[in-house]
Amino acid sequence: MATKIRLQRNGRKSYAFYSIVIADVRAPRDGKFTEKIGTYNPNTNPATVDLNFERALHWVMCGAQPTDTVRNILSKEGVYMKKHLLGGVAKGAFTEAEAEAKFEAWKNNKQSGLATLKAKLDEAKKAEAKARLEAEKKVNEEIAKKVAEKKAAEAAAKAEAEAANAPAEEAPAAEATEAPAEA
């Protein structure tokens, strides 16, 4: 039986996530499978992979052919690095302990790079949020200035109107006070 390691689609419309499965070559994409060895969610940044490393290595060593995407996932997770090192052990190039040490060094280097990437993404997200907040504050200050100018103009117009009305009202009162004095 020819086997493939491939992705099986799950999730709703426009939000796909995948199960990594071992399936017969002739089985349909979302059909019958032999074993589920992990999940892959491309919607997160960076993509989230949950993989049963031992079973994936077992199936790769048995000759299961991965699809292109799964091959990239397995490569990033280190399955192919481990296979390469085990091939070196089988040929006698180095011992299994040396192979394990090389694999751990590679894995630690990979994880530190991933942590750096996540930190950089978080920093960029914080900087973007801060820039948005500053821009919003600037816009709010401009709006507040315009509102203050408008209120000041309205107050000045109201004061002028009151000033214009006040002498007009005082003038007849003054005339009224002068008239009884003459009489």
From Swiss-Prot:
InterPro entries cross-referenced by the UniProt entry: Ribosomal_bS16, Ribosomal_bS16_dom_sf
Stored Pfam families: Ribosomal_S16 (PF00886)
BP GO annotations: translation
Keyword terms of this UniProt record: Ribonucleoprotein, Ribosomal protein
Cellular component, GO annotation: cytoplasm; small ribosomal subunit
Region described as Disordered: spans on this chain: 149-183
Gene3D superfamilies for the chain: 3.30.1320.10
Ribosomal protein found in the keyword field: yes
Ranges of compositional bias, category Low complexity: 162-183
Top-level lineage group: Bacteria
GO molecular function, one term: structural constituent of ribosome
Entries under PANTHER family matching the protein: 30S RIBOSOMAL PROTEIN S16 (PTHR12919), SMALL RIBOSOMAL SUBUNIT PROTEIN BS16M (PTHR12919:SF20)
Family: Belongs to the bacterial ribosomal protein bS16 family.
NCBIfam families: PRK14521.1 (NF011094), S16 (TIGR00002)
Protein name: Small ribosomal subunit protein bS16
Gene source species: Phocaeicola vulgatus (strain ATCC 8482 / DSM 1447 / JCM 5826 / CCUG 4940 / NBRC 14291 / NCTC 11154) (Bacteroides vulgatus)
